Amino acid sequence: MKAITVTPVTPRIGAEIGGVDLREKLAEETVERIREAWLEHQVIFFRDQDLTHQQHIAFASQFGELHVHPTVPHHPDHPEVIIIHADENSLQVAGDGWHSDVTFEENPPVGSVLRLTETPPDGGGATLFSSMYSAYEALSPAFQEFLDGRVALHQLGNLPGARHDE
């Protein structure tokens, strides 16, 4: 078995994983090493992985039960897969503001497994990530104390599928 490499990309968040072929069913030790890297670095990525929808689903399933987004259109044959596409004719770009996927649900998924298949010819289309652990640690002790123990209410708004439980 080829050794997995974990290379941090910033001091606070993100690591590149190498030495693994996501098209294959992974050994439990490999899944555990990837899970550890994810927990430590919060965002992980794998280069040069040409996956089908089925392989994408199979990889993600090794980390837990998959979620079907209640408000976003999904692939007709794979409800766990959301197709996000924008081009020069698009009137709106999905996810263009800071957000965390599906946090409006009572039990949101622990994470998202993204797969990029096409990039804009001009090099745009960046996806940015931020560490909320680092953001919290950068707060003053007084503000941390103010926030500790508080609960946030995340709402989806008036989109189809949004719940407004009191």
Q: Which residues does each PLM region occupy?
A:
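Non-heme Fe(II) oxygenase catalytic core, chiefly the N-lobe of the double-stranded beta-helix
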Residues: K2-E166
